[in-house]
Amino acid sequence: MSTSTEQIRQKFTEALDDLVAQVKKDRSILAAILCGSLSHDAVCAKSDIDLALITVDDKKIESSHLSLCAGDANVHAFLMPRAAFRKTVEGSVRNSFAHSLLAKGRLLYTHDETIAQLCESLHGIGRRDTQVQLLAAATQALPPVYKAHKWFVARGDLDYTALWILHAANSLARIEVIGAGLLADREVLPQALKLNPPVFKTVYSDLLNTKKTRPTVQRALDAIDAYLAQRAPMLFRLVLDYLSEAAEARSCTEIEDWFKRHFDVDCVATACEYLSDQGLIARVSLPARLTKVSNVAVEELAFVYQGAPPDEF
């Protein structure tokens, strides 16, 4: 770490210490958790401080955000009653953004030992949480992958194809990091590049640092296609299990509603289209009506699992 960086960190730390000393005197604040770069990463002069403040449970106190001054530093504080914090910790999907932000944070002080215990529990990542986050990352990767193929094949625009590949690369990086059992934060691409250099050099750093040609862009698309295809049974485990247990066709509306309600995951119909293209499920149709008062039935896209139950992840 350079001298200037050390000086900046020292300046931020001193400003934070002064603010926390003030906050400790507030009887309505039970704990302070330092989040963001200052808690676990490098900072620069333009950095700010992210601070979670856990308050007492009181009907007059609601979760809120407040921008504070600490010396020359800007502090983004989010206040959360203890009950809401507990609900967030116990109910948050592990490796979601909220979970990662708090799990990588540092408890500065607490007047309530149960808050310390809740913070400690953040470091566990369950199997089900991993499956949900892998599914979410994979469904987010598919649309930009399709866009990249479209702009490459139909338009021949290498720059715009590369842009969509880079969009997809961020979701692929989440897959790589989560699959390795690590916490995925906003800086997943550098993490993934260390974990899997051959793939992420091709779909990320090479696209940024070398001249784009049809062969290099094609290699990036091929690398993405192979990456997803090799991992499809793992990434879409929850979808395969759902359709396998249903033992009959489910419409896209039913599928989307079920995954949104149970896991808060969108775009699962797109995932089903991909799985159908991969031969892992079958594309069928079910009768549907366009409105509640329609007198004509149309065919809605649906999917069915055909084959032995999926292997365990």
Residue ranges, per PLM feature:
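Metal-dependent nucleotidyltransferase catalytic core
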Residues: 2-30, 35-47, 52-104
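Generic hydrophobic secondary-structure signal
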Residues: 16-19, 23, 29-34, 49-54, ...
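Conserved NTP/Mg2+-binding pocket subregion across the NTase superfamily
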Residues: 2-8, 69-157
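Short charge-dense sequence patches
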Residues: 1-5, 52, 86-99, 112-124, ...
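Conserved nucleotidyltransferase catalytic core and NTase-mimicking acidic/glycine-rich helix/loop elements
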Residues: 129-287, 291-294, 301-313
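Short, structured coil/loop segments at alpha-helix boundaries
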Residues: 9-13, 23-26, 94-95, 111-119, ...
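Charged, low-complexity, helix/coiled-coil-prone segments
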Residues: 34-45, 77-90, 103-116, 164, ...
